[in-house]
């Protein structure tokens, strides 16, 4: 086990150190664990690796990426932003509404894509009023990060949780007779919106925005809504006993997302009498993230086979004792702190089996249901990214947009918004989760 743990730590550090090569480092790690299995260090075969890959998650992610690209191209997000801003009295309300819009979109769309959709509107408003766009875009970024955990389709980490724990789209709203994580995220969002409203309390300049953007195609919006509807409907399908139908059942969410994406791309090709939209849609997919997840599935299965996951679960159990509240607080605090500096995708992927293992050790070894701890992990890992400029991809994207537009973004500018925003969201979100699930 020592060799496996050393290899895992080495490859994890490499993923943090060379961000641009993360997928290839993870793939190398997966290959190393397969080699150890081949050499007989522990039982891990190529067939085991293939079974470890959650193709439903990968298909779902790829399909959502493609549909979101078509949604952005339709210019519907910019139109929505203009419609909303046209009805607000001043800058304080404009920033709050943009943050709300970014959060709403991010519950169903990738966080970075959300920033790319909403940021241009924030920039335009700031320029018209001769304000610094820095706090405006930071508010948009942190709001999109917050809402990513609200639904199964909102963020890569949510999709990872759904795949690992067998949760469907509806489980994020209501599960086992209790409110799902969606409601805790929304309560956290209300608290953090109050923080934004207070931070922008002096920005009372009137806003005059005309609705100018023309939506080029309504179908991508319909496809996005249909994707959400079908994901919910798929949650209620009965599980077949076996055979091809069972295989299709295990891939149902991925097939829904990918099928609607391909339909949208094919329709765009038909409208333009060209294959260019199909090529552009496939170019828009984030192949780095897809390869990273593919590799992590194999790497973490190898780590588990070597006994590292069980050892980590024992360590957490020793630190928290047999008290669920202690474990919950430890997971939330550790996730917030670590995700402020490291990417939350590999962190959540690595921690999900650990959380499952710790839950099995609780209650004197009889085990308890892990859902509270899964949600606590996801809440902390998602919100922790808002503490620092490098804690989440959406933050990096927003800062990149600002710098391309000649703005200087200082760390203290980000912390002034990110820290109180995160503290409010974590305290209310994690607190309500405990009220729903822990008592």
Predicted regions and their residues:
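Residues that define the loop-to-transmembrane-helix transition and helix capping
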Residues: 23, 56, 92-93, 134, ...
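Peri-membrane helix termini and adjoining interfacial loops of integral membrane proteins
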Residues: 32-43, 75, 159-167, 203-204, ...
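Membrane-core helix-loop-helix motifs of multi-pass transport proteins
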Residues: 125-221, 365, 369, 374, ...
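Hydrophobic transmembrane alpha-helices of multi-pass small-molecule transporters
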Residues: 1-73, 79, 175-314, 409, ...
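Re-entrant/interfacial helical elements at transmembrane boundaries that shape
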Residues: 80, 113-124, 137-138, 151-167, ...
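Membrane-embedded alpha-helical segments and adjacent helix-loop junctions characteristic
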Residues: 47-134, 289-364
